[in-house]
């Protein structure tokens, strides 16, 4: 596919859908008033057209020459709130009367546009792909957090490894909560602060290039707005469980419980309001049928009640809103989340073949109490002032602090023991009773050497997880934003800045017991300055600033947003001092390059980049808008690639260890988008979008020679800007509404994401194996999912009379959604031969499959497609003016198997069998059970068997999950 093809598709769609038809013209006319009388000079716009008018001295207006159809009319006036009237029908040769009354604008409540009538299905003026999920829509879906909320939007792919927007990496997503970046900059997950679904007011996901107001995102931006209190007291308490009574013994129970509450209302009516919410979700996950630790422990917190299950999430929010006078609003908020679990995807910085693997630690299935436990604690606090300056301008000033910390330990153990008195490396050993390996055809002669079968392939020797990790990130941000618009709103200027002070600390140690004291027989202890097998320790204080401006022009239906964002950043005094001191850890060429490419200012050395932004929308015909967007975005490299092992004191002396590159440049994304929005009727909408993204200056690995403290030359892995990727695709979506009781949508996308490598470490493997990098082939990326189709429908019947006359079938809501998606990418294998039979010497033993040598075939195949259905049903009961809601949620309704870990021999997941009851010898010769050489094949057990068994329960998505719930609100 090429960009020209996408343009041709959109042009054809515009011609086909926009062909004019001969008909009479209609008009809309009326009067605009306030509580005092007519409003002269008010603006009346017919959205999705180039038509509009200004009211005359008596407040009247008339908009003529409108084609028959349904329209949305926006009425606005300086100093008054904007109101949109939807579903205004115009008929041939007739004039539709629409009178409007505006109220003075106040920032005391939620800013926004008042909608009279059914909300528009789409925003025909929007010049970029963005989807907004309202609080009511969130309540209708089976969701727990922000990722759940946006997972079913077009262009968004979520799986157990992360969330990907339009082919970008999971780490490229921007995550903003109430105007503050809320992702952990060191964890590499794309998210950080966890916000409970009951605290969400609105979630918007922007899948195209973000506008100038957002930064540090090269894939998409998730914008979260949390709830505020109102002048009406309200409270709610909810409980959901999948283990009620006999449900706990079924396969659809993950031993999950979810408790949440929220309360809000006035403290001083019309002046001071509050809102408080909390959520706790605890689950043993579907892997509980294989293994569950007796107790998940964290070395950060001793309280075991914080982690009653395998996966534990806590989230809380408190917010105060103060409106001392009209035009002034002050909001203060504190949010905190805590997660304790054993999911390795909590820390996604390094890794090569694990890029698309789920986080379940299958190797520790026999001793889960020795696996890695991850604890992430995040809190966000801010104070935001909104001040109206006059009837045409206002400012926002926000001071915020985000603090995130993540600890990974061996299920709560100290970073290393005071005394090494046992084997700590986890291994799979032969267990008792042993199994003798012999010829099954005849008895074993007495003088024959006996062999036993090896261990199970899973760790069983009491060894513990080999990585100990701790990091924290503090980010203090001051942000200011100024907005000014003309009286007729034909021009709007938004300009501002944000300044960030960061403080990062990173400690990562592999096999930390290496170098720990060992008590000798004479009572003395060994002495060592070794800090684990390998380690990386640093603390840095980088700085960032940004200046941004967006100019919006409106002219006869055309809306153009032209803007730019200037990003500046400094690596911090830590790097500047090492460069100035000519530290031996920084090669001379790298040091000189850093000095040449940075500019000294305010005691630090800075870099800068200008990012232009443009998006335009204009009506092709009534209710049909063509839009185009173009923008540059950037994301700074992960700090480990900048600072690793630069400190001469904390030097990792392991073979080919990482070396930070302080002169790394940011990764760049250039996004293009062309789309067509069609409001076919007030209840039907169709969108067609083509997009293209060029990504370059991605991080890869090169070999560099540096001198160690003794002067000996050593090879190090240096991160450099040398990789690229690109994404291209087409999206279609159709939305349908039937009165107030049915709403549905269908979206489909076809895209391709390709590049030189899928992780920052792909080139490292070539360097270690071959001494050079053979990475010149552009191949599909590991997370590429070409086809993604989603459909959902919401049926709402909130009437006293029963539906179809069935008693009790009233005041209910039903939500059903389905997803069909291309399967997981994998690199094919080829059949080499069969192993020799240990009894006969013939080559009729285990089939040998090896990964193909051709690098052009990397991730060239896709596994079997994924398909599943989710359902949520609820019934409301009125109790003395309050509401009690009973709910049923079923995920993966039809219990379909969708392979996350693909067997490259078959292109499917390893068959879902019970290893304890299956006769694997009888399955010899069955190609469905063939596996590559790096996995254990249970059909051919012999003394040389090695590798993990193929029974990892996380090889499939979660099976059917049934959750019951009750919610009481008043």
Where are these predicted regions, by residue range?
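Periplasm-facing N-terminal accessory domains of Gram-negative outer-membrane beta-barrel systems
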Residues: 20-123, 139, 157, 181-184
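Periplasmic N-terminal accessory/gating domains of Gram-negative outer-membrane beta-barrel systems
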Residues: 81-82, 87-101, 109-212, 216-221, ...
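Membrane-embedded beta-barrel scaffold of Gram-negative outer-membrane proteins
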Residues: 112, 396, 400, 619, ...
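Short loop/turn motifs that connect adjacent beta-strands in outer-membrane beta-barrel proteins
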Residues: 212-214, 229-234, 268-272, 327, ...
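Gram-negative outer-membrane beta-barrel transporters
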Residues: 238, 569, 687, 691-694, ...
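Transmembrane beta-barrel wall of Gram-negative outer-membrane proteins
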Residues: 253-345, 373-395, 565, 612
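C-terminal beta-signal and adjacent terminal beta-strands/loops
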Residues: 803-849, 864-868, 874-970
């Amino acid at each position: 596919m090429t960009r020209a093809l996408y343009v041709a598709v959109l042009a054809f769609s515009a011609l086909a859908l926009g062909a004019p038809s001969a008909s009479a013209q209609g008009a809309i006319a009326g009067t605009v008033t306030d509580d005092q009388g007519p409003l002269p000079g008010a603006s009346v716009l017919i959205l999705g057209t180039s038509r509009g008018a200004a009211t005359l001295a008596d407040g009247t207006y008339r908009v003529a020459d409108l084609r028959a159809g349904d329209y949305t009319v926006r009425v606005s006036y300086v100093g008054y709130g904007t109101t949109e009237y939807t579903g205004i029908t115009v008929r041939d040769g007739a004039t539709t009367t629409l009178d409007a009354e505006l109220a003075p604008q106040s920032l005391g409540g939620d800013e926004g546009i008042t909608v009279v009538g059914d909300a528009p299905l789409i925003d025909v003026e929007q010049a970029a792909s963005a989807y907004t999920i309202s609080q009511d829509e969130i309540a209708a879906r089976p969701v727990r957090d922000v990722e759940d909320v946006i997972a079913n939007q077009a262009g968004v792919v979520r799986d157990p490894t992360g969330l990907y927007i339009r082919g970008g990496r999971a780490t490229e997503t921007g995550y903003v909560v109430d105007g503050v970046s809320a992702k952990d900059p060191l964890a590499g997950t794309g998210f950080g602060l966890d916000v409970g679904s009951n605290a969400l007011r609105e979630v918007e996901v922007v899948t195209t290039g973000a506008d100038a107001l957002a930064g540090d995102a090269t894939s998409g931006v998730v914008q979260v707005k949390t709830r505020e209190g109102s002048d009406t007291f309200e409270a709610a308490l909810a409980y959901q469980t999948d283990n009620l009574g006999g449900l706990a013994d079924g396969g659809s129970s993950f031993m999950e419980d979810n408790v949440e509450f929220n309360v809000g209302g006035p403290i001083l009516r019309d002046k001071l309001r509050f809102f408080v919410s909390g959520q706790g979700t605890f689950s043993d996950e579907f892997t509980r049928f294989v293994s569950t630790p007796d107790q998940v422990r964290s070395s950060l917190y001793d309280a075991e009640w914080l982690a009653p299950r395998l996966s534990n999430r806590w989230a809380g929010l408190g917010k105060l809103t103060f409106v001392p006078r009209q035009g002034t609003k002050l909001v203060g908020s504190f949010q905190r989340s805590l997660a304790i679990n054993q999911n390795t995807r909590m820390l996604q910085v390094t890794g090569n073949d694990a890029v698309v693997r789920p986080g379940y630690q299958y190797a520790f299935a026999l001793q889960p109490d020795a696996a890695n436990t991850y604890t992430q604690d995040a809190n966000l606090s801010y104070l935001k002032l909104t001040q109206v300056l006059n009837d045409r301008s206002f400012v926002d000033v926000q001071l915020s602090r985000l603090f995130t910390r993540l600890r990974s330990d061996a299920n709560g153990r100290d970073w290393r023991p005071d005394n090494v008195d046992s084997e700590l490396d986890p291994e799979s050993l032969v267990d008792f009773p042993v199994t003798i390996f012999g010829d099954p055809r005849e008895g074993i002669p007495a003088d024959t050497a006996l062999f036993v079968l090896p261990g199970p392939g899973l760790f069983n020797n009491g060894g513990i997880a080999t990585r100990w990790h701790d990091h924290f990130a503090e980010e203090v941000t001051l942000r200011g934003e100024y907005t000014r618009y003309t009286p007729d709103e034909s021009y709007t200027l938004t300009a501002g800045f944000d300044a960030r002070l960061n403080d990062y600390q990173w400690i990562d140690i592999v096999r930390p017991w290496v170098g720990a004291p060992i008590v000798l027989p004479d009572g003395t202890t060994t002495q060592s300055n070794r800090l684990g097998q390998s380690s990386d320790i640093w603390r840095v204080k980088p700085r960032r600033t940004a200046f941004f401006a967006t100019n919006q022009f409106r002219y006869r239906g055309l809306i153009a947003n032209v803007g730019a964002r200037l990003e500046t950043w400094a690596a911090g005094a830590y790097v500047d001092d090492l460069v100035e001191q000519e530290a031996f850890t920084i090669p001379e060429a790298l040091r000189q390059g850093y000095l040449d490419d940075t500019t000294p200012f305010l005691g630090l050395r800075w870099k800068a980049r200008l990012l232009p932004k443009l998006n335009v929308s204009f009506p092709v015909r009534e209710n049909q808008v063509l839009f185009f967007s173009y923008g540059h975005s950037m994301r700074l490299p992960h700090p480990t690639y900048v600072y690793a092992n630069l400190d001469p004191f904390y030097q990792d002396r392991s073979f080919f260890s990482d070396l930070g590159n302080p002169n790394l440049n940011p990764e760049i994304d250039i996004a293009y988008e062309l789309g067509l929005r069609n409001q076919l009727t007030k209840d039907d909408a169709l969108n067609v979008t083509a997009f293209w993204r060029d990504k370059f200056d991605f991080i890869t690995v090169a070999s560099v020679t540096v001198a160690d403290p003794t002067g000996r030359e050593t090879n190090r892995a240096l991160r450099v800007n040398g990789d690229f990727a690109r994404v291209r695709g087409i999206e279609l979506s159709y939305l349908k509404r039937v009165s107030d009781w049915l709403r549905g949508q269908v979206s489909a996308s076809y895209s391709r994401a390709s590049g030189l490598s899928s992780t920052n470490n792909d080139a490292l493997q070539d360097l270690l194996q071959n001494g050079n990098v053979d990475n010149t082939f552009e191949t599909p990326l590991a997370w590429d999912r070409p086809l993604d189709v989603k459909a959902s429908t919401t049926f709402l019947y909130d009437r006293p009379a029963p539906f179809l006359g069935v008693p009790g079938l009233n005041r209910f809501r039903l939500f059903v959604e389905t997803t069909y998606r291309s399967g997981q990418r994998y690199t094919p294998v080829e059949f080499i031969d069969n192993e020799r039979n240990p009894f006969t010497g013939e080559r009729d033993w285990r089939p040998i499959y090896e990964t193909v040598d051709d690098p052009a075939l990397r991730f060239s195949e896709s596994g079997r497609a994924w398909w599943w259905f989710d359902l949520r049903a609820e019934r409301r009961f009125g109790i003395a003016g309050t509401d009690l809601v009973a709910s049923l949620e079923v995920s993966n309704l039809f219990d379909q198997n969708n392979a996350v870990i693909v067997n490259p021999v078959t292109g499917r997941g390893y068959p879902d069998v019970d290893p304890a009851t299956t006769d694997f010898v009888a399955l010899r010769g069955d190609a469905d059970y063939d596996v590559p050489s790096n996995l254990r094949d249970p059909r051919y057990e012999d003394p040389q068997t090695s590798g993990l068994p193929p029974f990892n329960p996380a090889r499939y998505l979660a099976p059917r999950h049934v959750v019951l719930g009750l919610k009481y609100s008043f």
